[in-house]
């Protein structure tokens, strides 16, 4: 199965799961130091004698039979490589407030009015992954990352081929779209800003490769009265001072945007007011009744001016 890493930057929590088990491959043999004559040398150090043949998997042909099949009833098992994540950790999470897009609204008329600001922009979430360069373990599996940002935000995800050398960078688009209506008095102006948290974090996942099973051996002439032997692969590794486990580290650096909100700044007073997007907003720090009074007074004055203008026209 593929590997899955779940990380929540806001909570600083991370977990990982998945496992791959397969018959030991040639690349695994190289990684554990059992390729070519190294396998024979390891058996020699364990048994004190160079074997005629040594195998970690079928076909292990000796005496006209496959030793793993012929002695399966005695518990002889091909060597299996097991790869699994054992820990995931979030390092150095950090966020800064940044302005995504702005809009300037001005009322250049002689009447109060409502002005609409459409705020939209597109940016990217990104992830760059790198691997331990010397592990030598090859697995045809992907690693999927689900990265949560802050509470209530939808997580974003990436998928990489496991263990691919060098760095891989992936980016996904993030769209910010909102609209707000602002009530402005004559001559008044504001800057409406769409802001978001821009964040960074590093996610480190540690994997472990281990082996189980037996190394099948053939000795001719017989060794201690027997041609065929099988011993735990880990016993043979330990006798040769070779590792019984290999640890691989994967590092992912993520950059993200989240937790957007809108505010506005009065062009004259410089006052910044946080706002939503479902109401009509008045940037001045006045009570609604006071603004309503001003609007009604202004409307009455306009009506009075119209009436006086009509009288002058009749004369």
From Swiss-Prot:
Comp. bias regions, Basic and acidic residues: 299-315
Designated name of the protein: Spherulin-2A
Disulfide bonds: none
Stretch list, region Disordered: 295-315
Protein function: Structural protein.
Cited SUPFAM superfamilies: Aerolisin/ETX pore-forming domain (SSF56973)
Native species: Physarum polycephalum (Slime mold)
């Amino acid at each position: 199965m593929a590997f899955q890493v779940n990380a929540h930057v806001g909570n600083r929590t991370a977990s990982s799961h998945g496992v791959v088990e397969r018959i030991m491959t040639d690349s695994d043999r190289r990684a554990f130091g059992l390729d070519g004559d190294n396998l024979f040398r390891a058996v020699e150090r364990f048994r004190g004698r160079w074997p005629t043949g040594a195998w970690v998997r079928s076909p292990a042909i000796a005496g006209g039979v496959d030793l793993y099949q012929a002695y399966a009833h005695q518990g002889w098992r091909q060597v299996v490589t097991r790869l699994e994540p054992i820990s995931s950790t979030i390092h150095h999470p950090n966020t800064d407030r940044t302005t995504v897009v702005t809009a300037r609204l001005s009322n250049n008329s002689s009447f109060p009015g409502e002005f609409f600001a459409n705020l939209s922009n597109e940016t990217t979430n990104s992830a760059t992954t790198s691997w331990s360069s010397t592990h030598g373990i090859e697995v045809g599996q992907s690693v999927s990352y689900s990265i949560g940002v802050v509470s209530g935000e939808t997580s974003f995800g990436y998928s990489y081929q496991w263990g691919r050398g060098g760095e891989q960078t992936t980016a996904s688009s993030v769209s910010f779209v909102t609209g707000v209506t602002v009530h402005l008095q004559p001559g008044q102006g504001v800057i409406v800003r769409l802001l978001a948290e821009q964040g960074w974090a590093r996610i480190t996942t540690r994997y472990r490769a281990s082996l189980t099973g037996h190394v099948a051996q053939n000795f001719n002439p017989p060794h201690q009265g027997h041609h065929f032997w099988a011993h735990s692969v880990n016993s043979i590794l330990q006798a040769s001072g070779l590792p019984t486990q290999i640890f691989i580290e994967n590092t992912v650096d993520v950059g993200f945007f989240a937790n957007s909100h809108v505010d506005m700044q009065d062009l004259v007073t410089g006052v910044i007011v946080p706002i939503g997007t479902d109401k009509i907003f008045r940037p001045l720090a006045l009570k609604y009744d006071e603004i309503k009074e001003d609007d009604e007074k202004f409307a009455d004055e306009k009506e009075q001016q119209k009436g006086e203008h009509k009288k002058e026209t009749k004369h």
